[in-house]
Amino acid sequence: MSEPLVFLPGMMCDSRLFEPQIVEFSKERMVCVAPATGFDSIKGIASEILEKTPPQFILAGLSLGGIIAMEMVRQAPSRITKLILMDTNYKAELPEVSAKREQQIIAVKEGRLKEVMRNEIKPNYLNEGSKKEFILKLCMAMADNLGEQAFIDQSKALSSRYDQTETLKKVKVPTLILCGLNDRLCPIKIHEEISFLVKNSTLHIIPNAGHLPTLENPKATNGILKEWLM
């Protein structure tokens, strides 16, 4: 049996973010999705996941999941045999983004989670295409499933994260970097920088996709993953 593959979802997403990948890759290996919840710091979430995962595994994170993945590599580099970073950001959060999150937290505490998620997802997450409305509804369903406290904790974790430049420079394992061509939240430039920092890395741009290529273009995403994992 091949090495286990652990997926880490983006903000307010659950295992459904990786449904096409779970279906494809569970045929040949153990696949699991670790929840990015329970703590209000990236360090805390990463430590908790490391306690519950196999001794060694392939790690794949998208967006917030990619940020957590980088912290897991920092904490336990010997346990990750291959690294996949998708539509993510290695930098500390900008002050203006943190200020926006504070306002979102206030709104969520007032019971306006759906409104906040709708305003955040529509302009930032998805490429224009036939699947957009379906994926929007799925994102809303995932957020509703996770609830207000998860939003608050994840927002605080993202706001307090630190720069992982030095972590990326030290990565020795094979690393795959994926980015949706039209990702406005974590643009291609960020992933080009990650590819430069990680010496043993490969960068692929996914066409017809924005911030969630695992759902927007699963065929292309799975094809690249399958070839790279061989």
Outline where the language-model segments fall.
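Conserved alpha/beta-hydrolase catalytic His-Asp/Glu region
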Residues: 93-96, 113-169
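Short beta-strand/loop motif that positions the catalytic acidic residue
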Residues: 171, 177-179, 183
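Gly/Ala-rich beta-loop-alpha elbow adjacent to hydrolase catalytic centers
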Residues: 61-65, 69
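Catalytic histidine-centered segment of alpha/beta-hydrolase-like enzymes
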Residues: 209-218, 222
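Conserved HGGG/HGGXW glycine-rich cap/lid loop of the alpha/beta-hydrolase fold
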Residues: 1-43, 62
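Catalytic histidine neighborhood in serine/cysteine hydrolases
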Residues: 192-211
